[in-house]
Design a protein with these regions (language model features):
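N-terminal, positively charged regions that mediate nucleic acid binding
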Residues: 1-44
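Glycine-rich, mobile lid/loop segments that gate access to catalytic sites or pores
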Residues: 10-14, 49-55, 82-168
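N-terminal low-complexity, intrinsically disordered segments
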Residues: 18-21, 72-76, 113-115
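Short, non-transmembrane amphipathic alpha-helical segments
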Residues: 26-29, 34, 77-88
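Short, charge-patterned binding micro-sites
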Residues: 45-67
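Short, conserved charged micro-motifs
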Residues: 67-75, 151
Length: 168
């Protein structure tokens, strides 16, 4: 074996206008709309967007369980995207236009198999199919005075720092 390449970490941090930000905003708005109907609603909705000059698509998929009539998911998605500024097909999406922006909704009620694991009292309640995400503290940022005290992976701290400067 010859010389080996040392391992490297990468990280991503996106700015306003990135499709991930729009997708998160739409999914958050759907959650908010469901919680207005039923404060105990269970919502697992993912959003995907793809826009090109002249045509765009918003795809909503997932599972929702709530007591009451569900919100109009397409209306929530269009309103959220247009309130952010996606109102011109020349910039990739006109969410106000039925002609230039399609919304595909694939949202069903929660599977009975998952539901039975999360129904019941808090002592025996499971997590269903939702994952648990976690981070970790480390000393990588301690060697950089401006980042000291964050106890964060250096690659992630630098990615966020660059993003903040781009948004100024």
């Amino acid at each position: 074996m010859g010389d080996s390449i040392p391992p490297s970490d990468t990280a991503e941090s996106v700015t306003a206008g990135h499709p991930d930000k729009l997708c998160d905003a739409i999914s958050d708005s759907i959650l908010d709309a469901c919680l207005l109907i039923d404060p105990n609603a269970r919502v697992a909705v993912e959003t995907m967007v793809k826009g090109t000059e002249g045509q765009a698509v918003i795809v909503l998929a997932g599972e929702v369980s709530l007591n009451g009539h569900p919100p109009n998911y397409e209306e929530v998605a269009r309103h959220t995207a247009s309130s952010i500024g996606y109102t011109d097909s020349r910039i990739g999406m006109d969410a106000t236009s039925q002609e230039y922006c399609q919304v595909h909704t694939h949202i069903t009620t929660q599977s009975q198999f998952i539901s039975q694991g999360v129904d019941g009292d808090l002592e025996t309640q499971g997590a269903g199919d939702q994952g648990v995400m976690f981070g970790y503290a480390c000393s990588e940022t301690e060697g950089t005075p401006e980042l000291r005290g964050r106890f964060f992976p250096l690659s992630a701290a630098l990615a966020q720092r660059i993003t903040r400067r781009l948004e100024i």
